[in-house]
Structure formats: C-alpha cells, structure tokens
C-alpha cells in the first residue's frame, strides 16, 4: 500500500519506512547491537539504548501526577493507570482494561479458550504458565511451602495459608444465621444446611436423605 510501501521478504509484513528493515533480523536471529556492560545483544539499537538504563539508572519518563520516574515508557503507561483506574489496553470482548499488553493477552484466553501450556506428563493444558507449574507438582510431589509453626509442607501457597489458621485460630467464615465461625468455606457450607434443612444426599436403597455426604456413607453401611 502507499502508506506501507516497504515489505519484509521473509514474512510479508509491511512498513512505512525503509529504516524498519531491521525487522528482518527477527528472522535471521542477528543481534548486532551489544551492551558493553554485560554483553547482552539486541536486534535494534533502540532496544540496546533502552536496556542500558539498567546500568546507568536513567529514568527519563516522569508521571505528571506524582513525579515518579521510570526507565521505560511502558512502565509509565502502566503506572498512570493507578491514578486513572483505566489501563491503556482494553479487552474488545468485555471492555476490561489492563496496564500492560501481556496482561491483556493473558486475559483474552478466557474468551478464546486458548490453553497453550501443556503438561508433558498427562497432557492437561492451561491458559497461563503459572497454572501449569502449580499442576506439575502433582506429578513431582514438590511441596515448596512450609509452615513455620510445625514444618508441614504444601504444594500450593493457598493451601499453606488455610493450614496456618489451625495455629492462629483465625476463622474467617461466619454463619449469618447463628454467628458460628469456621476455618474453611466448605465447613461453613455444610453447617448452613442445618439452618436451611437442605438434604442433598439421598440413599438409593431406602430414599432417606442427609445434609452431609459422610452421614450418607455411614448410613449406607446399614444396607
């Protein structure tokens, strides 16, 4: 097109300026711009200049709201959303906004159903890498989170946090009917059936119903 007359011979992507021909280095893997401090290499000079701020400490981008300074323009854009409450990257499906583009891409998988991270052990797939890493512990048996009180270990941080309530006595889940408090939300849900009279577990032998599954299992031993 007239607006983008320069074409990459490798992938057909078009550019408005011939100087953008550095894009072809994405295909060749060539990285001619090297940092003199740490020897890290880059495909374009602008990326090198941006990287060098890690070493110089230069922060040329300033927030006009609070004067906080940043090394990169993307960091400033993400920060500005803390003042406005609106991120610069909106989701076209649900209008939710994000401070960073990669967070938008991650969110969009909710709508597309894309799950690019697959477990090599069982084939289960996940939309985010963190989900895969957590899942893999079910195969490796890794339990990196240890209780500081009793040294019991857990595969997930959330499970550790729930366990710690045994030591702290914290009971964050309160029954609205009687005020009784519980460590786990599942315990509260079971308790609330006392007030509601709900008995969702039915014996297939005699039709008797129970509020809790363990009561049904105990009853079934009669038959």
Curated annotation (Swiss-Prot):
Instruction: Extract the PROSITE patterns matched here.
Output: ZINC_FINGER_C2H2_1, ZINC_FINGER_C2H2_2
Mention one GO molecular function: DNA-binding transcription factor activity, RNA polymerase II-specific
- Write out the annotated subcellular location: Nucleus
What SUPFAM superfamilies does the database record attribute to this sequence? beta-beta-alpha zinc fingers (SSF57667)
Q: Which Pfam families match?
A: zf-C2H2
Zn-finger regions (C2H2-type) at which positions?
6-27, 33-55, 61-83, 89-111, 117-139, 145-167, 173-195, 201-223
Q: Does the record's keyword annotation contain Repeat?
A: yes
CC annotations in GO: nucleus
The Gene Ontology biological process terms listed for this entry are:
regulation of transcription by RNA polymerase II
Source species, domain of life? Eukaryota
**What InterPro entries does the database record attribute to this sequence?**
Znf_C2H2_sf, Znf_C2H2_type
Query: Where does the UniProt entry say this protein principally localizes?
Result: nucleus
Keywords from UniProt, A to Z, are: DNA-binding, Metal-binding, Nucleus, Repeat, Transcription, Transcription regulation, Zinc, Zinc-finger
Q: Which family does it belong to?
A: Belongs to the krueppel C2H2-type zinc-finger protein family.
Provide the function of this protein. May be involved in transcriptional regulation.
- What protein does this entry describe? Gastrula zinc finger protein XlCGF52.1
Q: What is the lineage of its organism?
A: Eukaryota, Metazoa, Chordata, Craniata, Vertebrata
């Amino acid at each position: 097109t007239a607006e983008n007359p320069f074409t990459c011979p490798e992938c057909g992507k078009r550019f408005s300026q011939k100087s953008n021909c550095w894009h072809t280095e994405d295909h060749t893997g060539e990285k001619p711009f090297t940092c003199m401090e740490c020897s890290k290499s880059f495909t374009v000079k602008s990326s090198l200049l941006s990287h060098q701020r890690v070493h110089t400490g230069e922060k040329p981008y300033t927030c006009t709201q609070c004067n906080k300074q940043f090394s990169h323009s993307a960091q400033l854009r993400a920060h500005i959303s803390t003042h406005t409450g609106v991120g610069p990257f909106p989701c076209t499906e649900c209008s939710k906004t994000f401070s960073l583009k990669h967070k938008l891409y991650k969110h969009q998988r909710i709508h597309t159903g894309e799950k690019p991270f697959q477990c090599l052990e069982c084939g289960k797939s996940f939309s985010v890498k963190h989900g895969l890493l957590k899942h893999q512990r079910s195969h490796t048996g890794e339990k990196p989170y240890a209780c500081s009180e009793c040294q019991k270990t857990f595969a997930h941080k959330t499970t550790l946090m729930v366990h710690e309530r045994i030591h702290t006595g914290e009971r964050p889940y309160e029954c609205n009917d009687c005020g009784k408090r519980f460590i786990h939300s599942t315990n509260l849900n079971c308790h609330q059936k006392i007030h509601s009279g709900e008995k969702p577990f039915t014996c297939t032998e005699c039709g008797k119903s129970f509020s809790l599954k363990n009561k049904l299992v105990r009853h079934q031993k009669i038959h």
